[in-house]
């Protein structure tokens, strides 16, 4: 992602954002091939991201061939037309989003059903704390499915943060766009307005 000076990275905001998200995109490229992508649930602990996938997923094959991967956590918010900022300048039309790209090395890549069961147990603890279900372990109930899956841990090497929450410019300009988003009535625009307004709280006009 282009590191624009209009949107300086906020590490603490990025940490909160990633902790709230329930999916990311694994991007892996086999040597001499095209990048493969899969949308997956994840658990992040410190500098490690744990995921699982189907063994037949082409992205898993790409990871096996090349463990240098990117895990992309993103949230599309809204689109706003240029006229909400400047009637003349068409370049002021923009997308609003939040995104963190983690460059990682894939470690502990495993198809062992017990390893997969452990990863799924940690995922369920994170996504459904306190829920009641048959414990995830090898056996007649989960066994056939566990044997089809793989798990891996992604060791984070570096990250790139870009929160384009509101157009480039002053807090007043951003609040103006948030107001127009609320008035638009389009699905998701009210949530986008909430995010934009929260991002400029405490900023000067």
Placement of each model-derived feature along the sequence:
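Short, structured beta-strand-loop surface elements
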Residues: 55-119
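Short, surface-exposed beta-edge/turn micro-motifs
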Residues: 21-23, 66-69, 149
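Short, charged/polar surface micro-motifs in flexible loops or helix N-caps
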Residues: 32-34, 42-50, 55-58, 68-69, ...
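Catalytic micro-motifs at enzyme active sites that drive phosphoryl/nucleotidyl and oxygen chemistry
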Residues: 14-15, 28-32, 39, 59-60, ...
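C-terminal edge-of-domain segments
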Residues: 107-205
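An N-terminal domain-cap segment
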Residues: 1-50
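A general structural signal for short secondary-structure junctions and capping/turn motifs
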Residues: 15-17, 59-63, 142-147, 152
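Beta-strand secondary-structure signal
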Residues: 50, 70, 103, 151-155
